[in-house]
Amino acid sequence: MEGDCLSCMKYLMFLFNFFIFLGGACLLGVGIWVIVDPTGFREIVAANPLLFTGAYIMLAMGAMLFLLGFLGCCGAIRENKCLLLFFFMFILLIFLAELSAAILAFIFRENLTREFFTKELKKHYVRNNDTHVFSSTWNSVMITFACCGVNGPEDFEAVPPLSHLPLEETTPEACCQRKLQSREGMFVNRKACLEGDERFQNRQGCYTVILNSFETYVYLAGALAIGVLAIELFAMIFAMCLFRGIQ
């Protein structure tokens, strides 16, 4: 009976570690996607080290979980006490680090608010300057999502280098409607747009558009993080039980 329980525990631990392996692969994939993202969203928040570093933390955690899941599977199948103990200590450290990161993310969640992005836009944006990384990235986002600023064209009234100009002269070209949403796309009516004709401007703010586009993925990432933490907790319990059961 004891042998059957040990065998069952061994395969359960293998299963949990296989899920850790998959979770690590997912985090690794998301981290790589954020870093190499062709639309350059990372440049928008590059001024905030906490947000910019988050992708690299996710990448590192994904790589460690990927390796850890593989080692856990090997330790369970081979019934190696040394490998199981190493696995338990390592996954405990990762579990505590991830829990700390989740708490910090909750505490600093205001850094992703509408007000934060509006402040950063007004502080760093230079109109129609594609040699300026921050501005070029914002232009790409506005063209791709057919939106303007964080809240709308009025955001550009307070852009420092242009604050002395009327609203219609402060609206960037990137806010003008195009027949095709790309930099190569022809303007519907560029002149009327820059003169302030709202019919040819993208009036909706990018914050709402992007939030609606990525809302599903945000919830998915949160669910994935909770799932990974739960699996790690169960894996630690099974690892210690298996460690004590091996003669």
UniProtKB/Swiss-Prot annotation:
Residues in the Extracellular compartment per record: 37-49, 104-222
Superkingdom assignment: Eukaryota
Recorded GO CC terms: membrane
Transmembrane segments: 16-36, 50-70, 83-103, 223-243
Protein keywords: Glycoprotein, Membrane, Transmembrane, Transmembrane helix
Membrane topology designation: Multi-pass membrane protein
Induction: Downrwgulated by FOXD3 during neural crest migration.
Glycosylation sites: N111, N129
Topological domains annotated Cytoplasmic: 1-15, 71-82, 244-247
Pfam family, one: Tetraspanin
GO terms of biological process kind: negative regulation of neural crest formation; regulation of sprouting angiogenesis
Signal peptide range in chain numbering: none
Function text: Maintains CDH6 protein and promotes CDH6-dependent adherens junctions, inhibiting neural crest migration.
Family: Belongs to the tetraspanin (TM4SF) family.
Protein name: Tetraspanin-18
Organism: Gallus gallus (Chicken)
Taxonomic classification: Eukaryota, Metazoa, Chordata, Craniata, Vertebrata
